[in-house]
């Protein structure tokens, strides 16, 4: 079954602001690949991001955080960005902040 992909505006903005067009293309291709068997891709997240999944992209540096809505056969891309463990600009830190503020 093929899933429809929906990218939230904040994730679209982050994608558009990546200066390297090759990285943008790789991320877009990885997002498109989520339309086929998204449950088998990436890993399930815990804690504040429970119910979401994360996949690596662009040479393991970037993460794409998404949620699967089986009822509407849709993958909702909530956030994407660089993995910078311990940094306040880390993609997981930003995704948690957006969820707390109910912006995604």
Language-model segments: residues:
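Short proline/glycine- and basic residue-enriched helix-capping loop/turn segments at helix->loop/beta transitions
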Residues: 34-35, 39
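Basic/aromatic recognition patch in beta-strand/loop cores that engages polyanionic ligands
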Residues: 40-85
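Arg/Lys-rich, positively charged N-terminal/basic patches that mediate binding to nucleic acids
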Residues: 1-30, 104
């Amino acid at each position: 079954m093929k899933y429809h992909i929906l990218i939230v505006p904040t994730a679209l903005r982050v994608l558009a602001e990546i200066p390297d067009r090759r990285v943008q293309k790789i991320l877009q291709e990885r997002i498109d690949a989520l339309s086929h068997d998204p449950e088998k891709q990436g890993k399930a997240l815990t804690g504040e991001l429970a119910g979401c999944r994360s996949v690596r992209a662009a040479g393991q540096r970037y993460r794409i955080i998404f949620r699967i809505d089986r009822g509407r056969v849709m993958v909702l891309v909530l956030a994407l960005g660089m993995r910078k463990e311990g940094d306040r600009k880390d993609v997981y830190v930003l995704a948690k902040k957006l969820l707390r503020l109910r912006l995604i």
